[in-house]
């Protein structure tokens, strides 16, 4: 419907269209649309894509998506975001981050930087959402466990993270069951 509305306004939109939604008892509600990939949503989807992303985006720009077949890895993916204490409110910056190398050395784990910076040769926090840790696994539970295991290897003062990512799925509850 959104793309149809853009077309009705004379806009020939081609590219990423990220929708932010919230599940409510009345059903899903739109929070926002962005003309970019969503973060961390993309960080859990793209590791499963076997195709060259550049080729996919060029096909999109040239209205040729119907000429390619997306090929996906069979693995499950889970991403966990590491945040600074206080996020989404006020938070401190400049906290030294350690353990990323250990997490990145784990098979099927990728660490994505968001709110980080290098100061005096040290990697430090520089935002509320600091890192996203994505893991792939042959089952959802294995991917989730691997992601949390990798998160344990990373440390910085004030590190916070949600411990409930994927629990509804593990407990057999529908994600829409709010």
Spans of features found by a protein language model:
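Short coil/turn motifs at beta-sheet boundaries
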Residues: 14, 26, 73, 124-126
